[in-house]
Structure formats: structure tokens, C-alpha cells
Amino acid sequence: KVDKFQGDNRLEVHRIAGDGNGADDFGFGTIKFKDFGIQLDFYLLEDPFPTKIEILFRASIDLFFYQLIVNPVNGAGKKNIARWYKREGEDRGTWTEYIEHRAELPIPVETKAWYTLSILGRGSNFELYIKRKEEASSKKVCAWRDPKNLHPGGVMGIHTNQLQHYHIDNVKIYDKPTEVELNVESHEKLAAIWAN
């Protein structure tokens, strides 16, 4: 089974078979959106190897979607990095990475720790933020634009394949990206004047 809810209502994503392209390797939500904010907590496991998380957005069950993959610092392949993909239907050959939008994560993302991930979408513009769950402020990972706006609307989803095992909790989907609470710290200090 791809996923199951734990007693504490966390979603456990665990796939022990499959090639990553079958119907059981994808999970799709039901609420469609255009502009959006997605915020969720995630916890990567080591079972038996460090895993990654794969989130789909503006997705459809016909396999049209954008995809975010976050690899941990102790994972296989590209380490401590966010990668963006797109897919345009059943043809697996259309599942390609936006290599120019790869971004190193501003904090070390490790297995066996909780993180909060936020994806914002306004038209064809996207932003990614991350923080350790216990931290007050998110850090911006990157911003990018799809000039073709391949997928103007869809649902949230997940993708998994062999050896992926992680938990998701506190999933929130907002109609407006500005509703997501990021508490991002400014890189510039502002002067304040107090009046009597």
C-alpha cells in the first residue's frame, strides 16, 4: 500500500514495490486550485536508506503535473537540494527536470527530523520555503517561473516508488499564496522610531 494514516493522523508514505510509474505510485487530492499556497510538515525516514519527499501540485490523475523533490543532506544522489519537474501525461518521456531551477536548501535537511515546507504559486510563478518545524521563521529556497504555464490548475498529490518512506502531517492548502504564514526574516534591518 502506498500510504496509510497513523494513529496520530500522520500520513505514512511507504512503497516497497513498483517502478514509480504505476497507478499505485501516485496519490492525488480532490480539491482543484490555480493560485495556491501548500504548507505541510514532513519527516524523512531511513528504511533502510535515507529517503526523499516528492510533492505534486497542479496535478491531474491523467499524469499532468509539476513536481518538487527534496533530497536530504544524507540521501542518495543530489544532496540537500530541491529539484523541480514537470510531466505532460502518460508518456514517461515528458517527465523532465527543470535543471536550471535546482536549488541548494538553505538549511541542512536530515532524516529523522521534522520540517515545514511551503510552496506558493501565483500564475506561472512559484516560490519554495523551508524550516525546521520548531523554528519560527521559514527560509526562502528559491523562486522560479514557467513561461509556458503548462499546468494552470490541478490538485495536490504525492509520488513514491521503491525505498521511499516518510511521514506527512498538518497539510494545509490555501486559495491565496499570501495566506501562508512564513514569518520570513528580512535580510535588512529596519529602523524603528517610537512615539510617545
What are these regions (language model features)?
Residues 129-155:
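Short, solvent-exposed beta-strand-to-loop segments that form ligand-recognition rims
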Residues 38-40, 112-130:
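Short tryptophan-centered beta-strand motifs in secreted/extracellular beta-sheet-rich domains
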Residues 147-195:
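Ligand-recognition surfaces built from glycine- and aromatic
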Residues 15-92:
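Secretory/extracellular carbohydrate-interaction modules
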Residues 90-118:
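Short, aromatic/His-centered strand-loop micro-motif at the edge of beta-sheets
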Residues 1-22:
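Extracellular glycan-recognition surfaces and repeat-rich motifs
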Residues 63-65, 92-98, 134-143:
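Surface-exposed loop/edge segments in extracytoplasmic proteins
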Residues 24-31, 102-109, 157-158:
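Beta-strand-rich interaction surfaces with strong enrichment in secreted/lumenal proteins
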